[in-house]
Swiss-Prot record:
Belongs to the sulfotransferase 3 family. This is Heparan sulfate 2-O-sulfotransferase hst-2. GO terms for cellular component: Golgi apparatus; Golgi membrane. Homotrimer. The lineage of its organism: Eukaryota, Metazoa, Ecdysozoa, Nematoda, Chromadorea. It is an enzyme of class 2 (transferase).
Amino acid sequence: MLWKKRKVLYFAGISVFILILLLLKLNSKPKANVWPTSSKIVIYNRIPKTGSTTFTNAIAYDLYKENGFSVLHVNMTKNRQVMSLPDQYTFVNNITTWTERLPAFYHGHVAFIDFQRFGIANPIYINIIREPLERLLSHYYFLRYGDNYRIGLKRSRAGNNETFDECYSRGGKDCDMKQMWIQIPYFCGHYHFCTEVGNPEALRVAKQNVLEKYLLVGTTSRMRDMIALLEVTVPDFFKGALGHFDSLDANRAHLRYTKKKIPPNDQTLSMIRRDEVYKMEREFYDFINNLFDAVFKKATNGISKADDLVKLPLQYHFEKIKPS
């Protein structure tokens, strides 16, 4: 009889325990998709000939010791800017689990990768773009005359002194408007249509990614303003960046300056400005420029001075705190 009572109590206890577990499971809220290391990784998917070498070397590589972070270059095979889906997965997995390197600043000529597609929160994305024709001209003459960064290196078009005007008039490859289709794809990402020259969907997605996935995108002409914004927005990486940038001599503050550039004539400019690819890239540039200008003015209370930005007090405070 005693054994039967104990058996009943035993099964009753098990039933209550199972019931409690079920209730806890039903009442528990699903955990948010939080990646604790997301704020410890900055990705700068840099675009060629936009001042990216200056920004990377004069800021990231100069400040990593003082601010205590790692800097890593993402070297893309055969100068590709996109990865296969498996490579995207391993890339996301590698940099989010490589805890020994955190906090980390990654940079490389690679199109935007959306970490959220793999169930992980995106890191801090930043970038810099340049007026599209200026960027193309810089790249065109860079291939022929090189720059002030790696002086002894012979470039692929060395000895070819054809001007951009001459190239454009004969329909040359180096000055083809397909060569201008580069900044939109970098922000569009890895969808198949991103690299399709002149695809309107690529422009739409690029704009959307800038708004939703990037912390900040600046322009080459306002690099100093961008550095000031980053210093107060991501101080763990960019503390002291503006003062350091201002202390650099002219050569270090403008690395990879193309040695010789010949401005195109009015006829060439007129034809390029009517080209649909240029119009789209220019629309994207203006979109970024206007967005950055609005962010900067808001951050500086309309003063629009980088020097004042790092000194401005907070525009909010906490009060009525309970428990006191």
